[in-house]
Amino acid sequence: VKYMVKNTLEPLCKGKTPPEILSLRIADIACGSGIFLEEAYQYLVDFCTEWYKLNDKAHLLVVEEGVEKLPLVDKKAILTNCIYGVDIDIHAVEVSKFSLLLKLIENETEPSVMSSKPILPDLEENIKCGNSLVTDEDVEGLNITMEDLINIRPFDWQEINGGDKFDVIIGNPPYVKTEDIKKLHTNAEVKIYKKYGSSHKQFDKYYLFIEKALDLINENGLMCYIVPNKFLHTESAEKLRLMIKDKIVKLDDFGAVQLFKDKTIYSSILTVGTTNVEKLAYRTVDNVAHLWNDEVEQYSLIPKQGLNCMPWAENSNINDDSPWLVSDDDVYLSMMKKARAKIVSLADIVDIYNGIQTLSLIHI
């Protein structure tokens, strides 16, 4: 989380003054308990603190010898101006607000809060409950019950941040495959999800969150998500790849390294903007500890035009919907290219209707 926040906010904060920082708008549209929002808030507080140390030390409060901190009124301004979140779970929303308020008063003392009343700001306008993927317009004209409407929780984006777009959307969106979407949601809700341009074949719900995030960031904005790396090559992600191909900025690929306990997920950190970039900054991460300690290899800049794709996709590149073979290993890429002429796709031999199905836990 720290790594994602730093990588996303650092270029946006560079060269700004604390008053200019207050114009930044950062959101997590599936915020859960608010972990990403807490970290984003702390990054901005630390940035402003360091700025004042260099430019106006008298603005800071001296806690003890050698320790200075930002006044509570400044921290409140950062929280209420810059940090926004949405989640469909009302309990998660309340936890997120509570966590942010605890973070706000961290290391505060009775004297330090006396000049800032009320001590705790109201975050009702910052952290909202609703379905980030469904708007009121989406459900208009649909024949759905009031119970279904309550469960769907359509969200009006005019109700947050004044309806304006965000500078950064960051987070860890839910991963839900199509068959589970159909089990967990009503037909009406599934129908709405299928209107998304990235909903193709056996799509995953995180595709939709990527698409929605790109719609919600401003012209210079960035989206940074941790998502499974299968979107690089699965057929269901064809439309998503087409959607992000020109605007993908960075990709940290963890390969087989596992980030989540008790779950086998092949993860990546995906950063996408709104403007076209010619080269993809790519690197593999083979040790999570190195990432936290900033000891990972530098990014390889891979030209998007002619970016290596799956070798059995004849004459393919990043400008079509073919699977992407992204690697910074030149030896591996060379081997794959040499094998291209000899590889026969299984799809050229048989008709494939579904992949191998894992055994349901109910039968184990």
Language model features by range: what are they?
Residues 1-72, 92, 136, 140, ...:
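Class I S-adenosyl-L-methionine
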Residues 38, 45, 93, 97, ...:
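Signature of N6-adenine DNA methyltransferases within the class I
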Residues 75-79, 187-190:
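Surface-exposed beta-strand-to-loop junctions
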Residues 85-86:
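Conserved SAM-binding motif I beta-strand of class I
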Residues 73-76, 124-125:
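Extended charged low-complexity segments that act as oligomerization/scaffolding linkers
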